[in-house]
Amino acid sequence: MRILVLGGTQFLSRAVAADAVRRGHEVVCASRGHSGGVPPGATLVRWDRDEDAPAALTGGGAYDAVVDVARQPSHVRRALAVLADAHWVFVSTISVYADDADPAGPGAGRLREAIPDDVDLAEDPGAYGGLKVACERLVLDAADSAVVVRPGLIVGPGDPSGRFAYWGRRAGDTGELVGPGDPSSLVQVIDVRDLATWIVTLAERRTTGTLDAVGPALPFADLVREIAPDATVTWLPDAFLEAEGIAPWTGPDSIPVWLPRPAYDGMLAHDAQPALDAGLVVRGIAETARDTRDWLGSDPAARIGGITREREADLLAHWRNRTT
């Protein structure tokens, strides 16, 4: 197949391009080229998507499939104007769902209101879900055939967000760790490599429809046990963490993956079975954590989110002082 990856230089889109090359496809990546190189074996066509598509994008012939991770509607419109006859795999997000307490998926979960015009996400990060809703609709309306995948939390080596790196750094730890909130709270992640492989499979099979791209949900305690089976985990209640100034999900004073409950009961508890039935294969959490730890050790520039180990030790000390 001849596959066009819109992007191809960072995290997920780069993993998609690399997997497609490994599987023997002809891969073209369209990107400004400012965020890194394309994988070996792929061809780069430079395209700033704030402008119309360059002639070089389509000059080499038709594409069998297009993979797009865009978040701005104008970028999707420009691509569809010249590429609508290919099979599209559009990578959206579970952030399109309006109710984070509800795990309902495609066809059942209520969507956010579409935002059809571009928004600077640095100024308004809350617009992300609505922008993706608009992008989904553009693709489904204009492409000859298409599948929309809605990933949850994408993790693994190369993650620029630093969220799962917090836990990957703890892979194999044997000391005491903070477990945030309720250990029975459901969480789910998907390894970027598994997602990329599945996206290429969807392109090969010309799968259509809309699917949540998530791994199986599991209790938070099980996730931590997979990451650090020999560690002692002390679970600290939400109220205590909030009183200590610890934020959920992301940021320097956060514990990543932890979310307020019940407001976010559904966000990391979507049904993985439809994706598994459609060919998604997921590796174990322990493998993802180990590989993330190894990547952190090999890349000094890798981002690690969340509180420091020193802050974690302070939390444990404060907790013991409160309960003794």
Language-model features and meaning:
Residues I3-R23:
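N-terminal Rossmann NAD(P)H-binding glycine-rich loop of SDR-like oxidoreductase domains
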Residues L6-G7, G156, P180-S185, L211-L218, ...:
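Glycine-rich Rossmann NAD(P)(H)-binding loop
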Residues T9, H34-A86, F90, V96-D99:
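NAD(P)H-binding glycine-rich loop region in Rossmannoid oxidoreductase-like domains
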Residues E26-R32:
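Conserved glycine-rich Rossmann-like NAD(P)H-binding loop of the short-chain dehydrogenase/reductase
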Residues R78-V133, V147:
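Conserved Rossmann-fold NAD(P)-dependent oxidoreductase catalytic core, especially the SDR/UDP-sugar
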Residues S92, C135-G158:
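Conserved beta-loop-beta element that borders a ligand/cofactor-binding pocket
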Residues G168-V178, S185-R225:
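Alpha-helical substrate-binding/gating segment
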Residues T201-G266, D271, R290-D291, P300-T324:
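Mid/C-terminal beta-alpha module of Rossmann-like enzyme folds, strongest
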